[in-house]
Amino acid sequence: EKQEYKEGSRKISAYYRETDPKKLAQLDTIFKQVMASLHWLEDYTGVSYPFAKYDFIILPGFQYGGMEHTGATLYNDNQMFLSEHPTPDEELRRTELIAHETAHMWFGDLVTMNWLMMYGQKKFLPTTSPPASANFIPGH
């Protein structure tokens, strides 16, 4: 399935196989978290989102929490579609995952390090996820 979310002139598409209506009801929150992460990173870096589109694909059984690619991010379904009553920790993990993978659009896709420096990129990004996600944790 595909669902689109639009804010101003920016459109984001989500692709997924989930059919549970209770889980699909979380898409609005996920879209808002992705959009907030994009805005925060644009403000933080002073660089507009650098690619023509942004999509995310929620995959059943995906082996990682998330993996960004230019213009699209793959996410594990269990990391994105939470239980009907998620704990604050589960919501925080999802929010930080979105912030982390979105940050890769600037730090990894727009500016790519050579392979020998990849360790540094993975160590730097955790410092951007907490401040990026602090502004859009549900209920705060």
Predicted segments — roles?
Residues 1-99, 128:
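Hydrophobic helix-coil surface modules that form long, contiguous segments used
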Residues 9, 123-140:
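Acidic/His/Gly-enriched intrinsically disordered linker/tail segments
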Residues 48-56, 113-117, 140:
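Surface-exposed patches in mature extracellular/periplasmic domains of secreted proteins
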Residues 59-62, 78, 108-112, 121-124:
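An acidic- and aromatic-residue-enriched active-site/binding cleft used to recognize and process polar
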Residues 98, 102-107, 125, 129:
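Active-site His/Glu-centered metal-binding helix of metallohydrolases
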